[in-house]
A protein has these predicted regions:
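General beta-strand structural signal in soluble alpha/beta enzymes
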Residues: 103, 128-133, 173-177, 235, ...
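NAD(P)-dependent Rossmann-like dehydrogenase/reductase catalytic/cofactor-binding core
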Residues: 189, 196-200, 225-235, 239, ...
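Rossmann-like NAD(P)(H) cofactor-binding subdomain of soluble oxidoreductases
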Residues: 55, 61-145, 162
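NAD(P)+-binding Rossmann beta1-loop-alpha1 motif at the extreme N-terminus of oxidoreductases
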Residues: 1-53, 62-63
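Internal alpha-helical scaffold of NAD(P)-dependent oxidoreductase catalytic cores
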Residues: 82, 93, 119-127, 146-233
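Electropositive phosphate-/nucleotide-binding environments in soluble metabolic enzymes
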Residues: 10, 14, 34, 62, ...
Length: 332
């Protein structure tokens, strides 16, 4: 394979383009804004979203979607709210039927609860679909720091092909057939990262943060298995691995959102101060809705939703979590 396309030139899309280029693959990196494509082509750097990382000569920034999609592998690295629009645009752009579509977006569709691969499959039913997810901060991948990730696909031959494409001495790739579990783990952890950030903003210590993250994992498994994921997947890189890096890293946008909420800022002010999308905010609403539809007990998601929607202050939400009726640890 000599060509690949990356739809979305944010920090993660740009970082993945550099991974592919290091494998000797020609990469078309699609930007929604023509001026961004021109800036990146001229400076060989994504100054807005991934400054300091040089774009190799095999990476071609472009704003021409139809020309971009004529590749063997197409990575979709866009905000979850835009996935349905992009999927429809890809279908209209006559994507080759043998092109492998890989979702690298962590979220659920608002209102429907559809996973990103389900959205892609609905618009492009004849194409093979996969997911790539794990504890992967773009800033570290761009600097070629040691990283591991998971590729999920129902077709293991395709998963193995993608594994080969994405493997570098410093970028280790595993495979899995549990597409749903991989996607659900990667999306739910964004909610718990906001909660971990709230605990920091409130000035609580490591004990409280560790409790939130651990109970968040239990809640992730409880909800995720009900929505179609395998329990063991949530114990892997795309589950607990991604949860840890997102809750504890300074790179985490969702953690930053939570920290500012805990410090007393309202959600509009928080989001207005950010240049990149924090998926945990729409994810919180989507998983709150999904849990209600499924009848699953999700006390942490419930309180996160109450804070984000402005119904409760962070300190009241935390107090209600701490003062739930006592129960065995293995109970929900």
């Amino acid at each position: 394979m000599t060509t690949a396309s990356v739809i979305g030139a944010g920090s993660w899309g740009t970082a993945l383009a550099t991974v592919l280029a290091q494998r000797g693959i020609e990469v078309k990196l699609w930007c929604r804004a023509p001026e961004q494509a021109a800036q990146m082509a001229a400076s060989r750097e994504n100054r807005r979203y991934l400054p300091g990382v040089t774009l190799g000569e095999l990476i071609t920034p472009t704003a021409d979607l139809k020309a971009t999609v004529q590749s063997g592998v197409i990575l979709c690295v866009i905000p979850s709210a835009a996935m349905a629009e992009i999927a429809d645009s890809l279908a209209k752009s006559q994507v080759p039927q043998d092109s492998i579509l890989v979702s690298c977006t962590k979220g659920l569709e608002r209102g429907t609860g559809r996973r990103m691969t389900e959205i892609l499959s609905a618009s492009l039913p004849d194409n093979p679909i996969a997911v790539l997810s794990g504890p992967n901060h773009a800033e570290e991948v761009g600097r070629q720091l040691a990283t591991a990730t998971v590729i999920g696909c129902n077709d293991q031959d395709i998963a193995l092909r993608l594994q080969e494409i994405f493997t570098l001495p410093w970028f280790r790739t595993y495979t899995s057939e549990d597409v749903a579990g991989i996607e659900l783990g990667g999306a739910t952890k964004n909610v718990y990262a906001i909660c971990a950030g709230i605990s920091e903003g409130l000035g609580l210590g490591d004990n409280a943060k560790a409790a939130l993250v651990t109970r968040g994992l239990a809640e992730m498994i409880r909800l995720g298995t009900n929505l179609g994921g395998a329990p063991e997947t949530f114990q892997g890189l795309s589950g607990v691995g991604d949860l840890m890096v997102t809750c504890y890293s300074a790179h985490s946008r969702n953690n930053q959102v939570g920290r500012m909420l805990g410090e007393g800022k309202n959600i509009d002010a928080v989001l207005g101060s950010m240049t990149m999308v924090a998926e945990g905010v729409p994810n919180t609403v989507s998983f709150y809705e999904a849990a209600r539809r499924a009848g699953i007990n999700t006390p942490i998601i419930d309180q996160a939703y109450a804070v984000i929607s402005g119904h409760k202050s962070p300190d009241i939400a935390l107090n209600e979590l701490l003062n739930r009726n006592p129960r065995p640890e293995t109970d929900s």
